[in-house]
Regions:
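Phosphate-binding loop of NTP-binding sites
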Residues: 7-157
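Actinobacteria-biased recognition of intrinsically disordered, low-complexity terminal regions
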Residues: 3-5
Length: 157
């Protein structure tokens, strides 16, 4: 695999993931954060609903946000060992001095990743990380790779 990382959006996703106006990115992140806050205040958790709202407002949010990562995405999926493997991988990359985004709450489906991103992105939609190590349930990994092409995938049994 080449050392340079392409940030180009695949042809089939270009219309969805094209850059939005700055106010739109702000509105998307602000709405998602508000829903997360409201969910937690009302004791409803808030790990999936903010992601659902953001997906409705801006279907290209996930693709565009993770597309900012210069070293790409590592996807961890399978039946057993996802959380441990994800934490070990993120820890190893952090020990190398890289800034790593991960979904630490265990909300391991696409909406959960979007919700986790809301805590890390700026209100302008910028993600300050070099790479992401993401745990995804095997049933949702297929939906994830339709939006984001991981640089590496670890499939566990």
């Amino acid at each position: 695999m080449a050392n340079n990382v392409s940030r180009d959006v695949p042809q089939d996703q270009s219309s969805v993931a094209q850059a939005r106006k700055p106010w739109y990115a702000f509105a998307t992140v602000a709405a998602g954060r508000f829903v997360r806050f409201a969910s937690r205040v009302t004791k409803h958790g808030g790990s999936a609903l903010p992601g659902k709202v953001v997906e409705k407002i801006d279907p290209g949010f996930l693709t565009r946000t993770l597309g900012q990562l210069p070293l790409g995405v590592v996807l961890v999926s399978g039946t057993n060992g996802k959380t441990t493997t994800t934490r070990m991988g993120a820890s190893m990359l952090s020990d190398l001095g890289l800034k790593v985004f991960t979904n630490p709450t265990g909300s391991n489906f696409v909406r959960g990743v979007v919700s986790a991103l809301l805590t890390e992105v700026t209100l302008g939609g910028k993600l300050d990380a070099d790479s992401a190590v993401l745990e995804l349930d095997e049933a949702y990994a297929v939906h994830f790779v339709k939006q984001v092409k991981p640089r590496y995938a670890l499939l566990l049994n």
